[in-house]
């Protein structure tokens, strides 16, 4: 499944603001940890613009 950059950014923010562990939040969202951390690394390296495919 492909996610638009805006949705990836929203997911990164949800995980960051959650009081739950990242794994649990991602499980509830149905997002694989590997996928999330790939997005997160891209976000850290290049900001929101780096999330565009």
Predicted features, each with a name:
Residues 1-53:
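Residue-centric detector for conserved, function-critical "anchor" positions
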């Amino acid at each position: 499944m492909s996610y638009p950059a805006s949705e990836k950014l929203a997911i990164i923010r949800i995980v960051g603001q959650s009081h739950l562990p990242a794994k649990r939040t991602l499980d509830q969202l149905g997002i694989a940890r590997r996928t999330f951390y790939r997005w997160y690394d891209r976000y850290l390296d290049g900001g929101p613009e780096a999330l565009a495919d």
